Structure formats: structure tokens, C-alpha cells
């Protein structure tokens, strides 16, 4: 948690002038090649070294016409949970509309509850600042290429159709716990081979990280926890492994 808080302070205090001059801004909404209709499922959550499950992810997706609603809830053995909902317009592109992010501690107490209105350019709700409730009513231009929660894997799955110089950039709303609008990039790192159930898999390797500008990025990337996706190519591509932090508190987790 201290690590993530230090990053937030660094971003706020040290980057203001640099970002305005040198930031690499995201482009238009990503082009959609792969997106399913109505699906649901559950996946065990493992610790960073594997072993016994420490929780479970529940996923629900419902599509009606050109609108899709995705809900992902991560429940942990200690009683804590992370919940993200996103509604987006999907036709030829992925255009975010609205959503909600909720983080609860092991006692079920809400630490973060944010509602995101992309067309209206508002983020409302509250977060806990070391036990003090802070109300949020943030007015910010949010373009349709603002993605969070379950929308991010949609970006990864459609990487090839949108990559420029092996990168795809977009904006996100990140609870730190205070909500911050960040530019993120998915970068292709090459291929990885793993063995699973006696089968050799050649997977595409991606990383997700914030980007502020070429001067600052090397410093930030050394500080932030690594978030990685291993994706099996196919029609559509499928997630073989996710490794990274569950939220701003930095607890590492693994999905396979």
C-alpha cells in the first residue's frame, strides 16, 4: 500500500508540467474484432506463487443489441472483495458509457465506491482515506476510449487490430483510493511457452502499465507492480494467465 501511495504522490506532485508537454495520449475507441454475447463463469484466484486458491472471480456479461454490460466480482477468503461493472456500446468500436467500482475490506466495509459516467464526464461516490470518508464529485473530460475493470481484457483480446508500434493506449479511472484519470498502455512483449496439462502452449505475452511520457516512464515502470497477460491465439483469443495486483493496495494475485 505504501508503494502505491508513493506513486500517487509522485504522479500528482512531480508530473504536472511534464504530462502536459510530453504525455502520450490514447487514441480513438478501439476497433472490435472479438466480443462475445451472453456469458458467465467462475475462476479460482491463486496467490502469486500458485498453490491453494485465495478467492474466486465471478464474471457475468449480457449483451442487448449494441450494448454490453460486464460485471466482475473478485471475492477473497479473508472476506474482502473487488467489484467492477462496465457498460459499453459495441459495434465496430468499444465505447464506454458508464460503470461502477467498489472495493470492500475483510469486514465487508466499503473502502471505495465510485460511479463513472463517461458521456457526462463525471466520477461520483466516495473513498476511505485512512478511515476518513472523502466524497467524490469529479468533473473530467472522459473520451469513449476510457476503459476499466473487465473492459481492459477486451482491449487485450483485440490488441492486434489496434496496435501501433506494439502498443495500445487508453484512459482509465484508477482508485488509488482517490480516483485518478490515467493513460495506460498495453505493450506486446513477445511470446512465452508454457506446459499445461501435458500440452505445450505458445502464448502472446502482454504487460499493462501507466504511461506519462518518455522522460518519466522508465522511473514509473520500476515502481509500479507488474501486470501481465498471457493470451492463447485463436478465434477468439483466450486468457491463459493473468498476474498482477488486485487493486491499489498492491496484493498480488494469479488467474489461470
Positions of the model-derived regions?
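Residue-level recognition of conserved structural "scaffold" positions that shape functional pockets
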Residues: 21-23, 138, 155-156, 205
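Acidic, serine/threonine-rich low-complexity disordered tracts
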Residues: 22-120, 166-256
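Bacterial N-terminal signal peptides
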Residues: 8-17
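Generic hydrophobic, helix-prone segments enriched in Leu/Val/Ile
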Residues: 16, 59-61, 96, 152-161, ...
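Bacterial N-terminal signal peptides that target proteins for export
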Residues: 1-9
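Surface-exposed beta-loop interaction hotspot
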Residues: 123-170
Amino acid at each position: 500500500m505504501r508503494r502505491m501511495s508513493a506513486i500517487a504522490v509522485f504522479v500528482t506532485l512531480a508530473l504536472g508540467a511534464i504530462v502536459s508537454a510530453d504525455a502520450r495520449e490514447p487514441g480513438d475507441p478501439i476497433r472490435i474484432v472479438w466480443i462475445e454475447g451472453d456469458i458467465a463463469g467462475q475462476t479460482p484466484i491463486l496467490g502469486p506463487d500458485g498453490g491453494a486458491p485465495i478467492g474466486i472471480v465471478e464474471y457475468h456479461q449480457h449483451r442487448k443489441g449494441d450494448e454490453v454490460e460486464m460485471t466482475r466480482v473478485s471475492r477473497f477468503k479473508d472476506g474482502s472483495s473487488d467489484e467492477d461493472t462496465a457498460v459499453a456500446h459495441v459495434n465496430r468500436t468499444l465505447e464506454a458509457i458508464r460503470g461502477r467500482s467498489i472495493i470492500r475490506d475483510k469486514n465487508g466495509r466499503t473502502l471505495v465506491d465510485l460511479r463513472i459516467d463517461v458521456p457526462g464526464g463525471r466520477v461520483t461516490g466516495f473513498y476511505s482515506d485512512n478511515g476518513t470518508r472523502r466524497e467524490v464529485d469529479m468533473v473530467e473530460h472522459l473520451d469513449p476510449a476510457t476503459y476499466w475493470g473487465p473492459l481492459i481484457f477486451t482491449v487485450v483480446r483485440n490488441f492486434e487490430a489496434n496496435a501501433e508500434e506494439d502498443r495500445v493506449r487508453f484512459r482509465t479511472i484508477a482508485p488509488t483510493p482517490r480516483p485518478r484519470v490515467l493513460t495506460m498502455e498495453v505493450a506486446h512483449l513477445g511470446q512465452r511457452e508454457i506446459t499445461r496439462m501435458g500440452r505445450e502452449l505458445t502464448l502472446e505475452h502482454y504487460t499493462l502499465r501507466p504511461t506519462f511520457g518518455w522522460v518519466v516512464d522508465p522511473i514509473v515502470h520500476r515502481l509500479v507492480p507488474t501486470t501481465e497477460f498471457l493470451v492463447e491465439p485463436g478465434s477468439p483469443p483466450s486468457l491463459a494467465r493473468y498476474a498482477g495486483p488486485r487493486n491499489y493496495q498492491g496484493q498480488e494475485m494469479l488467474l489461470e
